[in-house]
């Protein structure tokens, strides 16, 4: 039987390495955060600015290319079939789902005006969905597990929603900062709180997606590494004990796949809700700001 002798932790090139020393040899324990490492393929630097082409850039391009090719082959002239195949059914399912989501979550507008938001919502949903799903493929990279990527996406959408709010309502868009019925002495404090709350929408949109994807992938990686370490111990008792973590990893794959789909759905719903708030000002203020 392999006996535990020593567990060492090394820091090399800003990476942590765990080594388990047994009588039969050394078993490396992979770090669960190693899968999120950014690797520059084409380093580019201008002054203090870095424009390197990295693995997140590669997988984002692959995801975007896959989405565009899939939609192109289905929607091009003669591309659709009377009896749809699996890929055509997938595109049609998403194409039917997004307009229903827009109609349900964005109110107070005509159907034609609502459909102006359809391209943005459709591209955002499909991009997030395919980014999350391709992260489930072994040895791939989960783009949405990096905070700066999700934060950049959420802030871009947040700025666009704010511009839409000003385009439709002018300066009266600022009336959401002061709900009706608020005592005048409390108005400055409430305006500040509402402004902070509004700005935190962009943070919450990015943090929610990043945290869920990173936590789920880290958990699967930890259990997978534990199962692999037990398999490397060359002992029947450890092999039998490895079946538990192995079955847990297989069982977690299904919920993690559900999380990948649901997070794209939740993020899209949040964007639609923010668009609804920007286009339909349900809150009125005591002092109206006219155009």
UniProtKB/Swiss-Prot annotation:
Molecular function as annotated in GO: proton-transporting ATP synthase activity, rotational mechanism
Transmembrane segments: 51-71, 117-137, 146-166, 173-193, 213-233, 239-259
Protein name (Swiss-Prot/TrEMBL): ATP synthase subunit a
CC annotations in GO: mitochondrial inner membrane; proton-transporting ATP synthase complex
Keywords: ATP synthesis, CF(0), Hydrogen ion transport, Ion transport, Membrane, Mitochondrion, Mitochondrion inner membrane, Transmembrane, Transmembrane helix, Transport
Subunit and partners: F-type ATPases have 2 components, CF(1) - the catalytic core - and CF(0) - the membrane proton channel. CF(1) has five subunits: alpha(3), beta(3), gamma(1), delta(1), epsilon(1). CF(0) has three main subunits: a, b and c.
First-listed, main subcellular location of the protein, grouped into a coarse class: mitochondrion
Coiled-coil zones: none
Gene that specifies this protein: ATP6
UniProt keyword Nucleotidyltransferase present: no
Organism of origin: Vicia faba
UniProt subcellular location: Mitochondrion inner membrane
Reported function: Mitochondrial membrane ATP synthase (F(1)F(0) ATP synthase or Complex V) produces ATP from ADP in the presence of a proton gradient across the membrane which is generated by electron transport complexes of the respiratory chain. F-type ATPases consist of two structural domains, F(1) - containing the extramembraneous catalytic core and F(0) - containing the membrane proton channel, linked together by a central stalk and a peripheral stalk. During catalysis, ATP synthesis in the catalytic domain of F(1) is coupled via a rotary mechanism of the central stalk subunits to proton translocation.
UniProt topology in membrane: Multi-pass membrane protein
């Amino acid at each position: 039987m392999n006996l535990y002798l020593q567990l060492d932790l090394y820091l090399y090139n800003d990476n942590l390495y765990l080594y388990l020393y047994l009588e039969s040899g050394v078993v490396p324990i992979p770090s669960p955060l190693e899968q999120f490492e950014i690797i520059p393929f084409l380093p580019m630097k201008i002054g203090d600015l870095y424009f390197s082409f990295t693995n997140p850039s590669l997988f984002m391009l692959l995801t975007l290319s896959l989405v565009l090719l899939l939609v192109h082959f289905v929607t091009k002239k003669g591309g659709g079939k009377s009896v749809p195949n699996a890929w055509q059914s997938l595109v049609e399912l998403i194409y039917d789902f997004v307009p229903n989501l827009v109609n349900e979550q964005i109110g107070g507008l005509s159907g034609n005006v609502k459909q102006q938001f359809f391209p943005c919502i459709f591209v955002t949903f499909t991009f997030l969905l395919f980014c999350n799903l391709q992260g489930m493929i072994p040895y791939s990279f989960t783009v949405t597990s990096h905070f700066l990527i999700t934060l950049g996406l959420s802030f871009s959408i947040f700025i666009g929603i704010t511009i839409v709010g000003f385009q439709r309502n002018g300066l009266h868009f600022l009336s959401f900062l002061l709900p009706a019925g608020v005592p005048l002495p409390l108005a400055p404090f409430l305006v500040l709180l509402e402004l902070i709350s509004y700005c935190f929408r962009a943070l919450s949109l990015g943090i929610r997606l990043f945290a869920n994807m990173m936590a789920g992938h880290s958990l699967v990686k930890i259990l997978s590494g534990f199962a692999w370490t037990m398999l490397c111990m060359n002992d029947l008792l450890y092999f039998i004990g490895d079946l538990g973590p192995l079955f847990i990893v297989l069982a977690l794959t299904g919920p993690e796949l559900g999380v990948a789909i649901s997070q794209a759905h939740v993020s899209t719903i949040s964007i639609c809700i923010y668009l609804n708030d920007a286009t339909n000002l349900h809150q009125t203020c005591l002092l109206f700001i006219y155009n």
